[in-house]
Amino acid sequence: RRIIERLDLTIPQGESLALIGANGTGKSTLLRMIVRLAEADAGTISVLGDEVGSLRGAALKRFRARVGVVFQKHNLVSRLSALSNVVHGVQSRRSGPRTWAQALAPAEIRDEAMECLAAVGLADKAMQRADSLSGGQSQRVAIARMLMQRPQIVLADEPDASLDPRAGREVMELLFRLTRDKGLTLVFVSHHMAHARRFSDRIVGLGNGGIALDRRALHCNEAELAAFFEEPAEDVPAGQPALVFA
C-alpha cells in the first residue's frame, strides 16, 4: 500500500519545518526516503543538488554524511561513555579515500566531541556510561553525536517522544537553537502542536496521501491545528510527486 501518493514540496536552506499528521500518513516514511532508508517508487527527491534516488555506493555515503538524523530512540551504546558515543559520530564523515575526519588526530576528535557535548549542556557527563543517563540526557547525547557529523540538514523523527513534557520541550529547544545558530535546515516530525508552532518557520500537514496543510507557523492557530487532527484532511490534487531541498 502506498502511504504517500502525491507530494510536491520545496524546503529552503536554513528553514525549520514541522511535519504533522495522524499516525500512518507517512511522516516518518518521508524522512526515511530522504536518506534512502526507504525507497520511493515514483517521483524525485533532490537534496543539496543531489537526486537521492540515483545515488549509489560512495556517492550515497557522501550524501548521507551531509544529513544528520535524530530518531525517537537514541540508539546509544549503553556500555560506552557519553563522550565515546559522540566520537562515533565522526564515522559518518568517512565518506571517501581521504576525509577531514581521517585527517584529524585522536586528540582533535576528542576535543571536538567535547565541544559537541558542551553545546548540548552535557560536558560534565562526558565520562558517564550511556546507560546511567536519563532519557532527556540520552537524547542530548544523540544530538551531540549528530553534530559531530557536521551535517547541513537535520532530520528529527519525534525526538521528543517518550520524554516527559519538560525534557521533550528542552530537547526541541536545543535542536531548534543549534540548527538556527548554524544555519542548518531542520525537518522534524511532531505530535505536539505547541512544539510544531514554537520551533518551526513552517508547518506541513500530511493526509490522504499528500499535503493537506502548508502554512507559515506564525499564521497557524491552535484551533486550526487541532481541527487538522480531529477532522479528515481535505483531498489534494494529483500530480508527479517531488521533494526538493533548495
Question: What is each of the regions a protein language model found here?
Answer:
Residues 154-157:
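Catalytic Walker B motif of ABC-type/P-loop ATPase nucleotide-binding domains
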Residues 190-191:
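H-loop/switch region of ABC-family ATPase nucleotide-binding domains
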Residues 43-51:
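Conserved ABC transporter NBD signature motif
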Residues 129-133, 137:
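Conserved ABC ATPase signature
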Residues 20-22:
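The feature captures the beta-strand-to-loop junction immediately N-terminal to the Walker
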Residues 35:
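Helix-to-loop junction immediately C-terminal to a conserved catalytic motif
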Residues 51, 94-124:
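Conserved ABC ATPase "signature" region
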